[in-house]
UniProtKB/Swiss-Prot annotation:
This is Photosystem II CP43 reaction center protein. The gene is psbC. Keywords: Acetylation, Chlorophyll, Chloroplast, Chromophore, Manganese, Membrane, Metal-binding, Phosphoprotein, Photosynthesis, Photosystem II, Plastid, Thylakoid, Transmembrane, Transmembrane helix. It is found in: Plastid, Chloroplast thylakoid membrane. It comes from Amborella trichopoda. Its main location: plastid. Signal peptide: none annotated.
Length: 473
């Protein structure tokens, strides 16, 4: 393939400590990158880069399948999922597979099928990755022009963007079809403590769906993370699916406008930086979603949220002391505020004590006890159901607190338990990965902009001390 620009001009900073080492004929002299820079050597070899990406997809899908089967093999149906360190089975259960009323697992076979399907898929992807990395054409432009590309070809790049958007839209609709037609999904808000149901009455009103985007991200509002019914979640996926597919068709049929051609840097590294920036945002949003949202991430599978565990503790002791004769409506706590119940500044009746800061929690085990002005005293006295007591006691003792060595509970607790909530793991991992992706975004954006401007920040490698030293080997 004809190289459109000098690699040496664009990528002058990477150097080998030992210039004689070449790997598979792709040495630093011809690519501008040393062996350890991995796929950077394949920037202009579209066929080999395809192999690297397909092989990477194979590794991802292999992990999903293997980890899925590992979790199935270790799964004990009598214990809650969140007590067993599972992170994949809760996702499958949320999609309505293998669970019944109250989130009880009634069939693990769908989980086994999921693991096997992913393993088989990974074998296909692995073969494709090895084929394109080792045997297939180095570049696709000559033999398969539809799959070939040049990074500077703005029209081709937006066509590829369009194809990706259409695939994302199809993915959004897969969830919609599962919820509407193929067995439904798990709804933690179903009466009596959650159940799998088909979502029939979708929310398609743009004012509701896009209203989430206009909300404040702070307490009581919570931006899109505040979504608390499945009709809105599935309806939102209908909107997303249509937007992605229509946007994809638009990008395939059009060329970038002049303002876009001027505004963006059009190089492989620039596209990498845009992608890393987007993934970083996804990571931060996912972190907040799994930490605070108990509708998309039902507490039956992921364990309670932090606020939920705290409110569950207040509720559990209210139930106990009320049975022992306490008047929970008027009992005073050590601070002079209500011991069990108090009023918020806006007048709602909320739980008293330290958990007052989590007054805006909504959870399916608690909402039936609310009236028009917050918690309803008469319902608390007469209407508490056994399943609500059991669930709050369970959630009280499974707060999403814990350390890396799997010792759960409050840091000052002497009777520590071997429990860390999947919410802790998933929120922390997505925050950390989101942060690293953001750093990668800044790094590659800076390099891409510098290269486009015709200069490169970095050490002047011609006079680097290590070049005058004896090679290690």
């Amino acid at each position: 393939m004809k190289t459109l620009y000098s690699l040496r001009r664009f990528y002058p900073v990477e150097t080998l400590f030992n210039g004689t080492l070449a790997l598979a004929g792709r040495d630093q002299e011809t690519t501008g990158f040393a062996w350890w820079a991995g796929n950077a050597r394949l920037i202009n070899l579209s066929g080999k880069l395809l192999g690297a990406h397909v092989a990477h997809a194979g590794l991802i899908v292999f992990w999903a399948g293997a980890m899925n089967l590992f979790e199935v093999a270790h799964f004990v149906p009598e214990k809650p999922m969140y007590e067993q360190g599972l992170i994949l089975l809760p996702h499958l259960a949320t999609l309505g597979w293998g669970v019944g009323p109250g989130g009880e697992v009634i069939d693990t076979f769908p989980y086994f099928v999921s693991g096997v399907l992913h393993l088989i898929s990974s074998a296909v992807l692995g073969f494709g990755g090895i084929y394109h990395a080792l045997l297939g054409p180095e570049t696709l432009e000559e033999s398969f022009p539809f799959f070939g590309y040049v990074w500077k070809d703005r029209n081709k790049m937006t066509t590829i963007l369009g194809i990706h958007l259409i695939l994302l839209g199809v993915g959004a609709f897969l969830l919609v079809f599962k919820a509407l037609y193929f067995g439904g999904v798990y709804d933690t808000w179903a009466p009596g403590g959650g159940d799998v149901r088909k979502i029939t009455n979708l929310t398609l009103s743009p004012s509701v769906i896009f209203g989430y985007l206009l909300k404040s991200p702070f307490g009581g509002e919570g931006w899109i993370v505040s979504v608390d019914d499945l009709e809105d979640i599935i309806g939102g996926h209908v909107w997303l699916g249509f937007i992605c597919i229509l946007g994809g068709i638009w990008h395939i049929l059009t060329k970038p406008f002049a303002w876009a051609r001027r505004a963006f840097v059009w190089s492989g590294e620039a596209y990498l930086s845009y992608s890393l920036g987007a993934l970083s945002i996804f990571g931060f949003i996912a972190c907040c979603f799994v930490w605070f949202n108990n509708t998309a991430y039902p507490s039956e599978f992921y364990g309670p949220t932090g606020p939920e565990a705290s409110q569950a503790q207040a509720f559990t002791f209210l139930v106990r002391d009320q049975r022992l004769g306490a008047n929970v409506g008027s009992a005073q706590g050590p601070t002079g505020l209500g011991k069990y119940l108090m009023r918020s500044p806006t007048g709602e009746v909320i739980f008293g004590g330290e958990t007052m800061r989590f007054w805006d929690l909504r959870a399916p085990w608690l909402e039936p006890l609310r009236g028009p002005n917050g918690l309803d005293l008469s319902r608390l006295k007469k209407d508490i159901q056994p399943w609500q007591e059991r669930r709050s006691a369970e959630y009280m003792t499974h707060a999403p607190l814990g350390s890396l060595n799997s010792v759960g509970g409050v840091a000052t607790e002497i009777n520590a338990v071997n429990y860390v909530s999947p919410r802790s793991w998933l929120a922390t991992s997505h925050f950390v990965l989101g942060f690293f992706l953001f750093v990668g975004h800044l790094w590659h954006a800076g390099r891409a902009r510098a290269a486009a401007a015709g200069f490169e920040k970095g050490i002047d490698r011609d006079f680097e001390p290590v070049l005058s030293m004896t090679p290690l080997n």
